[in-house]
C-alpha cells in the first residue's frame, strides 16, 4: 500500500486511526497496540503477502536473541550470540538482495553459467534489518533494551509510517513514546501538524518528484545518446526527483505518525544547501548516516586510531553504505566516491584551508549531482551516456531561434535543433529553476513545522495543497527508496 494512494489516504489511515484511539479510550491499551501491529502487518502485506512470514520470523528471531543478550548470567557467550545474530540478519538480507549480484560476478570471473535466482526483493528488508541489528548491538552492550516486551518490540519494528522506507528509527526514540500514557489520547494539535506535513509530503511526491521523474526516465532509460543540455537536464531532474521523492515520503511518514502522537526523527535538513560533503551527510538521510556512524564507523575505530586508519574507516563505511543501497557495482562506486570525497574534505580541513561559500556550495552540489548518475544508472553504459553528454562529448545543441545570432558556432561543432527534445522541452529548464529555488531559498519541512501557526490561511493553504495533490494522483508511482 502506497502513501500516495486513495486506499491509504481515505481507507486505511482513517480506519486505523479511529479504531486505535477507540480501543485506547476503552482502556484496552494492549489490545490497541496489538491492533496497530496487525494493521501495520496488513499494510506491509498489501504488496505481497508471501513475505509476511519473513518479517514475522525476523522479529521473533531478533527478539529472542535480544532476550538472551540481556541475560546477566547467560551460559552462552554474549559475543557469540551477537555475532550469530548479526550474521543471520546479514545472510537473510544477502540472500534476497545480493544473490544475483554474486552469481553474476562468479559467472563473469570464472566464465560459468550459473542461473540467476531472480528473487523478488522483500519490501523494507534493508530497513528492518538495520533497525534490528542496532537493537541486537544495544542489547549486547547494555543499551537499555531489557524492559521491552514482545508486543512493544513488534510495534517498534512494524509501525507502518516508518516500516517501508524509514526513517531508520532507534528503539530509544520510539519505545518511550509507545509507553507514554499521554500518547494514548487524541491530540488535536498533533492531528493538525500531521495533516499539514503529510499534505506537504504528498505534494512533493505527486506534483514535484513525479514531474522530474518523467525527464529523468527519458534521459536515463529511453534516449540512446544525450547532448550537453539533455544530459544536464537528465542528471538534475534525477537529483531533484530523488530529493523530493524521498523527503516527500519522510514528510508523509512523519505526518502519519503524528496522528498517533508519535514523533519520528527528521531525515532531511536541506541537504542541497550543504557547503561540503560532510555537511551534506549531516543533512541527507540523517538516520542512515547515524546508523553508519554508530554501528560501522565507530566500531571500526572511528577517528581514534590515527589518520590513515580514519581514512580507511571512512572509505569502508561509505562503500558499505553504497552496497546497502543496491546490488550493483555502480552503487559500490557511488559509495567509494563519497568515501573519497570525505577523506579529501578531512585532509582539507586538517590543513586549515578555507573556501568561498558560493564556490564551496557549487563544488559540493555538482559533485553530488554527478555521483547521483552512478546511483541512478542501471549499468555502466547508462553512466557513460549521461557523463559523456554532461561534459559535451556527445555534442552541443542550441535552440533553433539562436541560430540567426550564433550560427557561426556551427563551424565549432555546435548544432541548432530541439536542444532537449530527447528528454523534455523548454519547460523542463523552467521546472529545474523552480527546483533550485525550492531547495535553496525556501525553508524545509522541519523548519516550517516548528514555526507553524494555526491560522485560517494555514488551513486554506494546506487544503489547497492536499486537494491539488489528490487530483494529481492519476498515475500512482512507487517511492524510489522502496527499491532499496
Describe the predicted segments one by one.
Residues 1-439, 447-483:
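Membrane-embedded transmembrane alpha-helical bundles that form the catalytic cores
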Amino acid at each position: 500500500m502506497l502513501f500516495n494512494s486513495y486506499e491509504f489516504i481515505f481507507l486505511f489511515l482513517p480506519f486505523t486511526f479511529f479504531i486505535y484511539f477507540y480501543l485506547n479510550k476503552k482502556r484496552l491499551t494492549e489490545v490497541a497496540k496489538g491492533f496497530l501491529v496487525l494493521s501495520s502487518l496488513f499494510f506491509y502485506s498489501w504488496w505481497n503477502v508471501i513475505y509476511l512470514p519473513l518479517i514475522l520470523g525476523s522479529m521473533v528471531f531478533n527478539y529472542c536473541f535480544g532476550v538472551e543478550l540481556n541475560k546477566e548470567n547467560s551460559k552462552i557467550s554474549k559475543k557469540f550470540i551477537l555475532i550469530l545474530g548479526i550474521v543471520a540478519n546479514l545472510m537473510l538480507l544477502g540472500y534476497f538482495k545480493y544473490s544475483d549480484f554474486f552469481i553474476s560476478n562468479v559467472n563473469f570471473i570464472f566464465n560459468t553459467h550459473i542461473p540467476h535466482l531472480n528473487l523478488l526483493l522483500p519490501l523494507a528488508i534493508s530497513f528492518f534489518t538495520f533497525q534490528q541489528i542496532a537493537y541486537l548491538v544495544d542489547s549486547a552492550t547494555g543499551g537499555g533494551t531489557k524492559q521491552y516486551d514482545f508486543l512493544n518490540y513488534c510495534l517498534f519494528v512494524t509501525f507502518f509510517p516508518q516500516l517501508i522506507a524509514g526513517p531508520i528509527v532507534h528503539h530509544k526514540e520510539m519505545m518511550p513514546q509507545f509507553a507514554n500514557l499521554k500518547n494514548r489520547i487524541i491530540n488535536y494539535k498533533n492531528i493538525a501538524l500531521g495533516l499539514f506535513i503529510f499534505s506537504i509530503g504528498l505534494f512533493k511526491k505527486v506534483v514535484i518528484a513525479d514531474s522530474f521523474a518523467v525527464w529523468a526516465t527519458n534521459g536515463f532509460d529511453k534516449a540512446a545518446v544525450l547532448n550537453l543540455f539533455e544530459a544536464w537536464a537528465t542528471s538534475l531532474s534525477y537529483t531533484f526527483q530523488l530529493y523530493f521523492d524521498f523527503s516527500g515520503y519522510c514528510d508523509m511518514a512523519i505526518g502519519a505518525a503524528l496522528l498517533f502522537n508519535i514523533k519520528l526523527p527528521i531525515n532531511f535538513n536541506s541537504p542541497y544547501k550543504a557547503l561540503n560533503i560532510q555537511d551534506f551527510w549531516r543533512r541527507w538521510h540523517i538516520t542512515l548516516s547515524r546508523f553508519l556512524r554508530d554501528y560501522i564507523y565507530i566500531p571500526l575505530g572511528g577517528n581514534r586510531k590515527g589518520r590513515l586508519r580514519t581514512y580507511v574507516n571512512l572509505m569502508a563505511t561509505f562503500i558499505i553504505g553504497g552496497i546497502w543501497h543496491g546490488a550493483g557495482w555502480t552503487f559500490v562506486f557511488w559509495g567509494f566516491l563519497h568515501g573519497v570525497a570525505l577523506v579529501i574534505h578531512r585532509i582539507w580541513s586538517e590543513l586549515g584551508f578555507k573556501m568561498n561559500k558560493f564556490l564551496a556550495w557549487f563544488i559540493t552540489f555538482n559533485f553530488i549531482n554527478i555521483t547521483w548518475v552512478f546511483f541512478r544508472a542501471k549499468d555502466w553504459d547508462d553512466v557513460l551516456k549521461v557523463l559523456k553528454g554532461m561534459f559535451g562529448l556527445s555534442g552541443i545543441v542550441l535552440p533553433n531561434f539562436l541560430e540567426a545570432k550564433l550560427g557561426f558556432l556551427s563551424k565549432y561543432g555546435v548544432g541548432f535543433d530541439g536542444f532537449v527534445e530527447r528528454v523534455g522541452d523548454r519547460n523542463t529548464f523552467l521546472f529545474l529553476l523552480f527546483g533550485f529555488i525550492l531547495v535553496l531559498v525556501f525553508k524545509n519541512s522541519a523548519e516550517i513545522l516548528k514555526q507553524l501557526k494555526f491560522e485560517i490561511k494555514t488551513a486554506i493553504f494546506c487544503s489547497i495543497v492536499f486537494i491539488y495533490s489528490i487530483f494529481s494522483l492519476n498515475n500512482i508511482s512507487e517511492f524510489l527508496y522502496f527499491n532499496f
